[in-house]
């Protein structure tokens, strides 16, 4: 393979750091250059004094990092000076450089002392390539494979080979893996799918490539139609696409990476080889299919709930207006009643004629309303809601029905009849007549029968369709599942296979390193119950102390009342001290941070094979500042000498969630190494983190943007969940403003890839749920939420009594159901181990 085809893995600075002599401090010199008896004997066996010193230095370097070096004398003269002054006291030596043969002889002794082998392509190359091929199935990123190669060499006691050697091997592994997948697709793919992919790339098919990449930005019918178009065009290809990708055994990370290539190349995808086109498009089709299905489901749920809420609002307003109108029509009702005593009316007249005169005074509906008013009754809100649904026939037959027909439902024990009814409804609506003809009356409650059945007991089929739609949203919490959509599928789909769990349960528990999960439930529950009783007693004792300043127990009238003390504001928002510090530009701060951490190097090119030079350093800084200040690259281009096209290209090449996360970890890891970091700990040797959501108004509509009058007024926005430890933002996730923050607390902790691992986590009330207490405890975290209304929480959870000596006694109001925990302990273990493996 030509050198130009080798992937660029390390930057020049990283190459110098790995393949150059390490920079030892005085403490490092004392540690790495100390010799045992065997090492000292071999060093003294060399006749040339300079080579003895060089052996000690290279041996110390090899202990620090197992790399074969051939440094110049002036590069290591300080370490040589330390050796002949401290380790092997002597007169020193004149400047010299080792010849290749002398270097090889010295390293033979180093390998002997360290029990290592020199890298040899013939002996070790094939085994390393096989190992990297296995690793590539999980993640083909060159840096990941490079780290895996270093780890393999360390485990096999092999000196790290030259950078060019690893470049060549990794390039070959990546190339062979893609060639293998392309060859498999050539053999296994049907001719029809090959033609469809070719038409997609060339733009000659019924679905243009540009239209495939377009996705819905909100829940309007126009936007959701984009997802429906994609669904209709690729639906019949998806079984074969899923089968092909399953035979390739691609990891989720690899599949996502390959799918992103389609967005990166865009119309330029046709310049790639046919095999690469197939691979990228198949991965993209599966990802796009999942996205389309999820948005179709979200859109269906949104419109059903919105219609139900609008129907409720309409019904309440209609009933109120009807009541007001009835009150105004009481006088006209008197005229209707007067007809029965009017002497001018012939008694022989048919009642129909009199009735017609009455209806000329008041309509039938108004007359009914007056009757209800006189009886102090109101029209049923439910009736008005169904009348509203009757008026929304176009929505039901149009958008909702199209979305509904794209979904496949499965039920559990309590929803099998509903799932069967939904499937039957879909079959009938997909038929030639496209009409719903049958209904399962077993699903109707006694209350709903009044509005879904006519006077003769026949079901109102249009209302029945609405009834089915309204049953779906609230049952997607596990009662009903959508097996084709990750977000709505059954819990078992995300757990370890049941058969595999039964056979390998104890092995999996040991590999998870969860001490609590491996214990017997009865023993664990007894131990935790004792700890809880002890803790409740200690809290009671603490509250009795006179110097307790953290919580107020009684008010002046003697009534028990729990609240936090309100602290007065003694500090200024803008302390005058900070006015003495000179102002520094954000770009200068970023340059300083990059100088100390090198985080810019984390922004690798999306293709991986590009040079890792720093020629785009200033452009990346401009992009980061522009996006962070919500100005975007367009706003940055307007106020700088960078063009929009230039910034847009660099952003597409370098700025991704993966690289942004790596850069953030780089800065956080460097921060954690600073001596001052531990002084921010609230408790000694304990990292106390917090998680909370910040609300940001969004300029563009996406599927995550939601209305929230409290935070955005009439606009839409998102919530940015951030995990903070000692003022370092170690992880973040953007969620919808309508989503509960507590659902993402565990995910923030588990997806944290930095070296800062929290011990304690605090959230506000919005981050609390019962599951988080159990999960975080099982995974070794301490959950310590901070409640806004602490008095209400204490009164809801605890009974506070006093014994004969008037000492406080705390106990739970609702006892913990330990029997249920023990009964479902196997399921709890399976869920926890499954989460650990994610």
Where are these regions (language model features)?
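A short acidic (Asp/Glu
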Residues: 71-73, 647-650, 659-660, 699-702, ...
């Amino acid at each position: 393979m030509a050198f130009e085809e080798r992937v660029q893995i390390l930057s020049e600075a990283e190459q110098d750091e790995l393949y150059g002599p390490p920079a030892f401090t005085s403490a490092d010199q004392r540690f790495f250059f100390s010799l045992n008896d065997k090492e000292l004997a071999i060093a003294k066996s060399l006749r040339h004094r300079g080579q003895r010193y060089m052996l000690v230095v290279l041996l110390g370097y090899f202990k620090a990092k197992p790399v074969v070096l051939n440094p110049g004398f002036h590069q290591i003269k300080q370490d040589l000076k330390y050796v002949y002054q401290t380790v092997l006291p002597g007169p020193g030596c004149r400047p010299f450089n080792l010849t290749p043969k002398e270097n090889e002889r010295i390293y033979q002794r180093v390998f002997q002392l360290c029990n290592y082998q020199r890298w040899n392509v013939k002996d070790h190359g094939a085994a390393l390539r096989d190992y990297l091929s296995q690793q590539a199935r999980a993640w083909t990123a060159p840096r990941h494979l490079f780290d895996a190669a270093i780890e393999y060499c360390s485990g096999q006691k092999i000196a790290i080979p030259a950078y060019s050697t690893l470049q060549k091997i990794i390039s070959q592994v990546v190339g062979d893996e893609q060639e293998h997948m392309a060859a498999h697709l050539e053999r296994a793919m049907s001719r029809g799918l090959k033609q469809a992919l070719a038409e997609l790339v060339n733009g000659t098919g019924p679905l243009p490539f540009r239209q495939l990449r377009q996705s819905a930005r909100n829940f309007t019918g126009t936007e959701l139609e984009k997802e429906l178009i994609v669904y209709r065009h690729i639906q019949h290809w998806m079984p074969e696409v899923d089968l092909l990708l399953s035979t390739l055994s691609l990891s989720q990370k690899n599949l996502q990476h390959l799918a992103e290539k389609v967005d990166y190349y865009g119309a330029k995808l046709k310049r790639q080889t046919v095999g690469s086109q197939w691979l990228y498009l198949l991965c993209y089709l599966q990802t796009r299919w999942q996205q389309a299905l999820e948005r179709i489901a979200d859109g269906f749920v949104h419109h059903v709930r919105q219609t139900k809420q609008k129907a409720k609002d309409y019904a309440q307003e209609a009933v109120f207006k009807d009541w007001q109108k009835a009150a105004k029509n009481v006088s006209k009702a008197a005229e209707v009643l007067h007809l029965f005593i009017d002497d001018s009316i012939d008694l022989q007249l048919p009642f129909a004629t009199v009735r017609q005169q009455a209806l000329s005074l008041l309509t039938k509906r108004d007359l009914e309303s007056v009757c209800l008013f006189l009886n102090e009754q109101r029209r049923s809100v439910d009736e008005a809601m169904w009348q509203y649904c009757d008026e929304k026939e176009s929505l039901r037959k149009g958008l909702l029905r199209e979305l509904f027909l794209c979904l496949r439902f499965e039920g559990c024990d309590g929803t099998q009849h509903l799932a069967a009814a939904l499937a039957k409804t879909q079959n009938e609506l997909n038929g030639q007549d496209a009409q719903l003809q049958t209904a399962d009356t077993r699903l109707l409650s006694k209350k709903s029968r009044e509005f879904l059945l006519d006077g003769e007991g026949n079901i109102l089929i249009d209302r029945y369709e609405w009834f089915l739609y309204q049953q779906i949203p609230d049952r997607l919490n596990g009662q009903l599942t959508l097996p084709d959509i990750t977000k709505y599928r059954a819990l078992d789909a995300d757990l370890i296979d049941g058969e595999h769990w039964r056979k390998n349960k104890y092995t999996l528990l040991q590999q998870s390193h969860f001490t609590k999960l491996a214990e017997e439930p009865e023993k664990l529950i007894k131990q935790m119950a004792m700890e809880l009783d002890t803790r409740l007693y200690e809290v009671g004792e603490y509250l009795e102390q006179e110097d307790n300043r953290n919580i107020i127990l009684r008010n002046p009238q003697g009534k028990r009342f729990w609240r936090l003390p309100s602290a007065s504001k003694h500090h200024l928002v803008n302390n005058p001290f900070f006015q003495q510090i000179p102002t520094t530009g954000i770009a200068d701060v970023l340059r300083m941070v990059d100088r100390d951490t090198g985080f810019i190097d984390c922004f690798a090119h999306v293709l991986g094979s590009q040079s890792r030079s720093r020629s785009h350093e200033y452009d990346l800084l401009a992009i980061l500042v522009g996006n962070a200040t919500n100005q975007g690259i367009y706003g940055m281009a307007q106020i700088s000498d960078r063009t929009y096209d230039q910034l847009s290209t660099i952003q597409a090449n370098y700025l991704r969630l993966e690289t942004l996360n790596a850069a953030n970890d780089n800065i956080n890891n460097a921060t954690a190494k600073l001596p001052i970091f531990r002084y921010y700990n609230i408790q000694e040797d304990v990292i106390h983190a917090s998680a909370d959501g910040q609300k940001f108004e969004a300029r563009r509509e996406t599927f995550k943007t939601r209305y929230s009058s409290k935070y955005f007024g009439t606009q839409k926005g998102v919530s940015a969940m951030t995990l903070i430890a000692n003022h370092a933002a170690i992880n973040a996730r953007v969620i919808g403003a309508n989503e509960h923050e507590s659902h993402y607390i565990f995910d923030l902790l588990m997806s944290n890839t930095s070296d800062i691992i929290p011990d304690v986590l605090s959230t506000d009330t919005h981050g609390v749920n019962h599951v988080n207490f159990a999960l975080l405890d099982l995974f070794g975290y301490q959950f310590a939420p901070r409640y806004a209304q602490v008095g209400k929480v204490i009164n809801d959870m605890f009974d506070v009594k006093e014994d004969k000596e008037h000492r406080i006694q705390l106990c739970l109001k609702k006892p913990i159901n330990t029997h249920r925990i023990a009964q479902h302990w196997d399921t709890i273990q399976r869920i926890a181990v499954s989460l650990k493996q994610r």
